[in-house]
Every structure is written in C-alpha cells, then in structure tokens.
C-alpha cells in the first residue's frame, strides 16, 4: 500500500494540511441523535476505547465491544474492563455484521490487521471510525467504497475524556471525514454525533482532515510533548548532579517541575508562565529560550520534513516488522538512566521554588512550544491545529511524568509517540550538551538574585512574548473553552 498523503498532488496536500475550522456550538444542536437507535461497535478496550464507550453509552447510544476470540477466551484486560462496566462483548463475527458504526480504537500498529479482519464482516453502507488517522494517511489502508470513514480525535488521554464528561464538560476534539470514503454524504453527521456523544462539543470542536490531524499529531508528540520533556529531564538532572545537587532533590525538582510550570501554561499560555518569574529571571529565561530555538530549529525542521515525506512512518513500520527492536532497546536504555533510577526526595518543594530554580526548564518549554508551533505553521498546518498539538497537550503529558517519571509518560503515550520521542531525544541530548556546559549560576537549581532591570528591555521582552502567534491563537481558543464551559455548566 502507498502512503496516502504521497499519492496526492501538491495542491491537494496543501488543502488537506490547511483544513481547520472551529465549529460553532449551534452546529451540535442535535447532539448525538444521528447515532441514536444505531449499533455502535468499538474494537479495542484500552484507555480511549473504554472511556469513549462509557461517555457514548451515557449519551444514549447502543455500545458494545468486539474483541478477538483469544482475548475473550483468556479473559484478558480488555474483556475484563468491558464486562466489568456492563457492556455487551462478543467476537468480530458476532457483532461486526450488525454494526452501523465500527470504531477502531486499537493501537496504531494493530490497525491494519484489525481493519482487514473487520472489513469483510461490515454490512454495506456501514461506517468505520478512527481516533487517529495513521492507518489511513501513513499506511494508506484502502477501505471499501461503500463504507464511510470518519475520525473523532479527542486532544487528551482517555481518562481525561471521561473525567471531563463526568464534570458536565468535555475535551477539545478534532473531527474529519476521509474524502475518499463518504459515499452517502453522511460522514460529517456521523462524526458530529460521535463527538457530541463523547462530550467534545462542549469544549470546542475543530473540523479538520485526516492528513492535518496525523501530521500535526506526530510532530507535536515527537518534539515538544514528549521528546523535549524527555531530553530536558535527562539533561537537567545530569547538570544538577554534576554541580553537586543532591540527586533526590534534583529528581524531584524536574519530575514535578514540568507539571507545576505547565499548569501556568495551561491557565494563561507562555505569558502567564513567564510572569511567574521575577523580572531578572524572566529576561534570562527569554534569552535562554532564544538560544535554544536557534540551536534546535534544524532538528525540529528535520522531524517535520520526515513526517511530511513519510520517512518517519516508513522507518517506524520497519521496526514494527522487526519486532520493535529499536523501540524496546530505547525503552530499556531510558529505564536505566540516572534520572529514572534516582532516589526519591522526601522533603517539600514549594510551588514558587519550581519556577525560581527552574529558569532553564521554563526556557525549554517556551522554546519547544514556539518551535513546534512555528514549524507546523510553516509547513501548511493551520494555527489552531498547531496550538492543540503543542501547547494545549503539554500539561497533560507533564502530569504523567509527575506520576512515575519518564516510565509513566512512555507507558501512557502510544507506541507511535514513544518511538518518535526516542528519535528526537536521542538527537537532542547530544545537540544541547555544549549549550548546557555554558549555563550560568541561577539558570538551574538556584534562584537568580533580584536586581535592577532595564525598563526598555523588559518592555520589549514582554511585547515579544505576548505578540507571538501562539499566544494570540491560544488566548482565543482558551476563551472559547471558558465560554463554552460556562454555558455547559449553566445549561
């Protein structure tokens, strides 16, 4: 099969990369009604599979789970989760033929096998759903022409999808219809109903394309979301310990520092994160971030180029065929790093201490977020998509590190994200070592002393931070979420 994106001409590629429209709340006035009375069969009962299914059932839809015969016979975790939550469970042969919508929520590397197994069983005119378009765009899976192919992609882990729904809200979501598979013109109606059933319409929905979702998702997770956090954790820990910091304290400062720093990012973007610093520290963080952007720009661009060309996907799929040899080797090596094996610190670190002693970490976050955003936009991806795949998801990934360090992050993210993370971090760590050697006292592990600052310089830095395109679009999108949450809670 050919990479679908590479079969398109340049005009088609640009059109699909640039497809992004923030949908109005009024477009979801019918809620999930288009799918009510129809049979929805979910394949896979992992975090997305289970939690989307719970939300959809609570929204009045008929949900069941199709699992492989072995999973049922051996009562594996997927079978236990589905049955313990009161769902009907059956084999592909038992459930797929009656399904109006089959939702494939298995891991990326299983998609081809799953789709080839379920396609012959699907009735004429049924629909096939994804929450990530890798199988369609990168693998180039060919779907029967009578089948409608749609995507609903929540921009959060599955657990968050459920928790926000239970709070009466939802998570921002991308929806799309595959242009090669919409024979009855009902793809958008199906996608909107599915998104509404998960609660996504309450937080904001972007009408996108399979291509834009895949290319931006891969770029975000490889660079700022996972790769930068992993590289930053390893570099910062080693630097602190080399300069005499207690390894346990250094580990805690980094493990929980990312989460604390990005919580400010979540509430008010890069502007608020930088405002948590003293004026001298803000000026230093800004200067460090500009240096980092200059050093790392070629690496970010290489990752984007390899994603656009399909080079990344072909390399990863070759590793799939080789029993994940590279992935498993990198995973094992990460588990043996000094950061992962450091002792736990029993003392308390105050919230402001993470900011005051983490100026370099803040600079890394700023540089990584802006670079990922800029590189995506320069490649034809619309700003709203680039925002969701960079700044918006970063606090969620930082939270996984706060739970069990890099191990937890790499367990929670997909194998696709994990593979890309290692590619980036293995290149980024040696790239930044000369930069790390030139750091000054106060950049990491100790606070920058208060002192006089140049008013004009501070004014210009504040203007530069606030005027960046990601701050402009971020303020708009966070405003939409706040407004929609207010409406949802009131209604």
Swiss-Prot record:
Pfam families: KARI_C, KARI_N
Induction pattern: In the presence of acetohydroxybutyrate and acetolactate.
Active site (catalytic residues): 132
pH-dependence annotation: Optimum pH is 7.5.
EC annotation from Swiss-Prot or TrEMBL: 1.1.1.86
Presence of the UniProt keyword NADP in the record: yes
Role description: Involved in the biosynthesis of branched-chain amino acids (BCAA). Catalyzes an alkyl-migration followed by a ketol-acid reduction of (S)-2-acetolactate (S2AL) to yield (R)-2,3-dihydroxy-isovalerate. In the isomerase reaction, S2AL is rearranged via a Mg-dependent methyl migration to produce 3-hydroxy-3-methyl-2-ketobutyrate (HMKB). In the reductase reaction, this 2-ketoacid undergoes a metal-dependent reduction by NADPH to yield (R)-2,3-dihydroxy-isovalerate.
Name assigned to this protein: Ketol-acid reductoisomerase (NADP(+))
Organism: Salmonella typhimurium (strain LT2 / SGSC1412 / ATCC 700720)
Gene: ilvC
């Amino acid at each position: 099969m050919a990479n679908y994106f590479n079969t398109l001409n340049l005009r088609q590629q640009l059109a699909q990369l640039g497809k992004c429209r923030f949908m109005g709340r009024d477009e979801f006035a019918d809620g999930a009604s288009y799918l009510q009375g129809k049979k929805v069969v979910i394949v896979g009962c992992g975090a997305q599979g289970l939690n989307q299914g719970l939300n959809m059932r609570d929204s009045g839809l008929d949900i069941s789970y199709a699992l492989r015969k072995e999973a049922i016979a051996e009562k594996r975790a997927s079978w236990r989760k589905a049955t313990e939550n009161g769902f009907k469970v059956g084999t592909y042969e038992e459930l797929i033929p009656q399904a109006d919508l089959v939702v494939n929520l298995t891991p990326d590397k299983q998609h081809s096998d799953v789709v080839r197994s379920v396609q012959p069983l699907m009735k004429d005119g049924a629909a096939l759903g994804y929450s990530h378009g890798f199988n369609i765009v990168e693998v180039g899976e060919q779907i029967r022409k009578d089948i409608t192919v749609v995507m609903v992609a929540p921009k959060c882990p599955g657990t968050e999808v459920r928790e926000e729904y239970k709070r009466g809200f939802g998570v921002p979501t991308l929806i799309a219809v595959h242009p090669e598979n919409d024979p009855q013109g009902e793809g958008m109606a199906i996608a909107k109903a599915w998104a509404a059933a998960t609660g996504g319409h309450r937080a904001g929905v972007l009408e996108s394309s399979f291509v834009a979702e895949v290319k931006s998702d891969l770029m975000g997770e490889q660079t700022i979301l996972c790769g930068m956090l992993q590289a930053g954790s390893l570099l910062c820990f080693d630097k602190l310990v080399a300069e005499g910091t207690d390894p346990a304290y250094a580990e805690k400062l980094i493990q929980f520092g990312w989460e604390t720093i990005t919580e400010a990012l979540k509430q008010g973007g890069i502007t608020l994160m930088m405002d948590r610093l003293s004026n001298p520290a803000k000026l230093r963080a800004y200067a460090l971030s500009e240096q980092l952007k200059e050093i790392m720009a070629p690496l970010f661009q290489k990752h984007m180029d390899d994603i656009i060309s399909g080079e990344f996907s072909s390399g990863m799929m070759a590793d799939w065929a080789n029993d994940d040899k590279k992935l498993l080797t990198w995973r094992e090596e990460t588990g043996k790093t000094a950061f992962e094996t450091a002792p736990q610190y029993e003392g308390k670190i105050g919230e402001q201490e993470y900011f005051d002693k983490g100026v370099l970490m803040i600079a890394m976050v700023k540089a990584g977020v802006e670079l990922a955003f800029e590189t995506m936009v320069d490649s034809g991806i619309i700003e709203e998509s680039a925002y969701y795949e960079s700044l918006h998801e970063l606090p969620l990934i930082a939270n996984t590190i706060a739970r069990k360090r890099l191990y937890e992050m790499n367990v929670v993210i997909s194998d696709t994200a994990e593979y890309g993370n290692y590619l980036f971090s293995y290149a980024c760590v040696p790239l930044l070592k000369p930069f790390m050697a030139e750091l000054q006292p106060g950049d990491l592990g100790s606070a920058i002393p208060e002192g006089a600052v140049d008013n004009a310089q501070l004014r210009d830095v504040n203007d530069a931070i606030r005027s960046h395109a990601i701050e402009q679009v971020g303020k708009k999108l966070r405003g939409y979420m706040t407004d929609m949450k207010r409406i949802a809670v009131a209604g």
